[in-house]
Amino acid sequence: MLRALLVAAAIVAMTLFLIPLQWISILLRAPTRRLIPVGYHRALCALLGIRIRVMGQRTRLRPLLLVANHSSWLDVPIITAVAPVVFVAKQEVASWPLLGLLAKLQRSVFVDRARRHKTGEVNAEIAQRLNDGDPVVLFGEGTSSDGNRVLPFRTALIGAARDALAAATPGGGVMIQPLSITYVGLNGLPLGRQHRPLAAWYGDMDFVSHFRDLLRHGVLDVVVSWGEPIPYQAESDRKAVARSLESRVRGLTLAAQRGGRHGPGAGSASQPFLFMAKEAKRGRFVWPGLRRRGGRRTDPPCDAP
């Protein structure tokens, strides 16, 4: 209970400190508008005891659309901790207490599925993010699941993204990269099907209860897997693209689940990103762009712009 209170107090203090800084950065279009969310979510993951391993590489090609699976509110801080991104979210998120404000400060694009006549405005906003060089994250399932499986991808969401491409680039083309977030371990032990929903937040689950339970469980191991990017043109068949992305994300998720808490190929050609829980407790947490090894500054693992 004491740990939960201390963590909550630290998160509140950090949030109150960074909100005005991020707001000013957005108004001034300063580079820090991308870096502040990365640093904030890294610190948040560290405080929550989330340990992340990154498999594969995020492409540096732009414009870039990332299509991922979705099982928890934790997906957002985890993805942002490893890459400076913006999200496409449903309109209801904008009205959620605190989470809605944080989503706005991360320059999320909100989609109102009930107001089809607003589609043009939404597409223009997505196009603006792509033109600015921001990787845009789209949750292909359109909802969250229990984390044990990848739900069918909604072709309408892919179609909406395609419509935005025409405005984003003269040729209407973009790179689209599959992305998987898989919760694989708890306190160093493999997280099986029965316990994976401990990390998931879906249906009508209460946020406060889920947050409290998360603090009780200890260190949570997560694998973030980057798939091979594919070119996506305005004339592409959205159904075929959606099926391909769904298959790739499902394959990445299954590979991570079978690989246990270290994910597939641990110790081989992976890109480890494990400072979150343990290094933060040792006082070794570093802000994006300020990581030091042997007294020398090195680039952060999220290749911040």
Residue ranges: model-predicted function:
Residues M1-V54, L101-Q106:
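A transmembrane-helix-recognition feature enriched in membrane-embedded lipid enzymes
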Residues R62-A68, S108, D134-G140:
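Generic beta-sheet signal
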Residues W73-L130, D134:
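Membrane-embedded segments
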Residues L99-G100, G147-S236:
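A cross-family acyltransferase "interaction/gating" segment
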Residues T119, I126-V136, G140-F153:
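Soluble extracytoplasmic domains of inner/organellar membrane proteins
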Residues F273-F275, F285:
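Aromatic (phenylalanine/tyrosine) cluster motif
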Residues T298-P301:
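Short, intrinsically disordered C-terminal tails of secreted or membrane-associated proteins
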